[in-house]
């Protein structure tokens, strides 16, 4: 009698335990979702702002509404804009990783299956961040740069103001190295 050396997925018995969903975990899931949306907006803004054509920039400068004002202000210092986008996106992505790790640890006990725990916590979470926080927003904003720039103009303007001290250090260190 011959046996199959490779087990089928239904024959694999994972020794993991699930814990009940608590209020803290539910809040963590909601905040993680909000942070993924923030990551998407920040990532999309990078492509949107830096792919605006000169004619679109000229069109914006001729308008006198609030969104056009904020877009023009954001574009005044491309170094500050890029530094803000990079720093903010890193902060948000670190928050996503920390919260999702907490959430997974609170829901599932991978003590007896550390490799499966690694796959869930690192591979799947990285995939979610890349797909929903980076790739999809950048593809969308490539095709709708003006619309995306208008959507994120005011929040990005205030994010630039908040992160200016950190950005200044980043910009100074970059110019010092050059």
Where are these regions (language model features)?
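Membrane-embedded alpha-helical segments of inner-membrane proteins
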Residues: 1-178
